[in-house]
């Protein structure tokens, strides 16, 4: 069974939330690609739509959006995801992973594209319950 750490970013709040996805929910993500919009109910965010933006595998190799399939491959890179050249025009062969989610992916990055009725904090149980105002001491 696959287990993923999904990092869901909320552009409105400027916050990111880490969610552990296991078993049946994780299997729903296998085969999806970078750029696919997924129902947020898979992560426990009912009513939300989430777009997959990237991720990495257990060895730390990043998912590259323009490499098809779930495989690892050494490609010649000049710029882009997974490589920053030190000098202009420098190219280097780097190991990257394809854009498809596979069972050996560890982390999936995503962002919210459609919001639900409840806040993400409330759905994940991070919102503190509202406290009743303290009564003034009687004199």
Swiss-Prot record:
The keyword Translocase does not apply. GO terms for cellular component: ribonucleoprotein complex; ribosome. Keywords: Ribonucleoprotein, Ribosomal protein. It holds the Pfam family Ribosomal_S6e. InterPro entries: Ribosomal_eS6, Ribosomal_eS6_arc, Ribosomal_eS6_CS. SMART domains: Ribosomal_S6e. GO terms for molecular function: structural constituent of ribosome. One of its GO terms (biological process) is translation. Signal peptide: none annotated. Belongs to the eukaryotic ribosomal protein eS6 family. This is Small ribosomal subunit protein eS6. It comes from Methanosarcina barkeri (strain Fusaro / DSM 804).
